[in-house]
Amino acid sequence: MKKLVFVPVFLLALLVRQAHAQMYVKAIRANDTVPIKGAIPVKYEGKVEECYEYKDAAGLHLFLATSTSAGKYFLGTCYTLVNGNYVQDWQIKDYSSLEVAMADDYTKIVDIDGDGIYETIIIYEYPTEGNKYGGTTWKLLLHYKNQKYAIRAHQKDSDYDEEDLTMDKTFDTLPKSLKKYVMQYWNKLAKDQNAMEMFDLKK
């Protein structure tokens, strides 16, 4: 008969605190207006928009956002260090015939639910195509437990146009704390852009 091993609550709490104490996020490039701090340890093409090194309970990671062809192609890629080499975990791709630009200083690498694993939030924009009135398309992408969740909005430039806001139905499957955090963060963007009528997500 196997013996049960009981871990004291205080020891378990200590181990959790130690794991969280080892977590960090370091900006190699916070946005495209500041210099790159140090070498980027993966191959890439185009311009580095943002780059972060971060460590959590799953290991050491790198998030790299790049744009190519005058900003028309956008890639957001996450890597994890495995046996001394960075291996791609996931990637976000987007394209505009004009330009795709990240919203400066809005990238979030944060442990929202406190499980020791970082979630990633990125926000970017590009000119709305196929709309005779123009305008801007905004996207927020959350990466959580190997799945992507998106909020999309069309910001109008003309009084003859209509604004539009859509949220992936999969957001309803998120834990309430995560969904609330992301909605509040999106609303912060709305406030910063003076576009509350379009962006304001109801709690």
Task: Give names to the regions the model predicted.
Residues 4-15:
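Sec-dependent N-terminal signal peptides
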Residues 16, 21-48, 136-138, 143-203:
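Acidic, small-residue rich beta-repeat scaffolds with periodic aromatic anchors
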Residues 30-90:
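N-terminal "first-domain core" detector
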Residues 58-65, 113-124:
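Acidic/hydrophobic-patterned starts of short beta strands in beta-sheet-rich repeat architectures
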Residues 63-71, 97-99, 128-135, 140:
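Short consensus segments that form the blades of beta-propeller domains
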Residues 73-74, 105, 121, 134-138:
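Short, surface-exposed coil-to-beta transition loops
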Residues 75-114:
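Short N-terminal edge-element motif at the start of the domain
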Residues 108-118, 143-149:
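A short, structured loop/turn motif at beta-sheet edges
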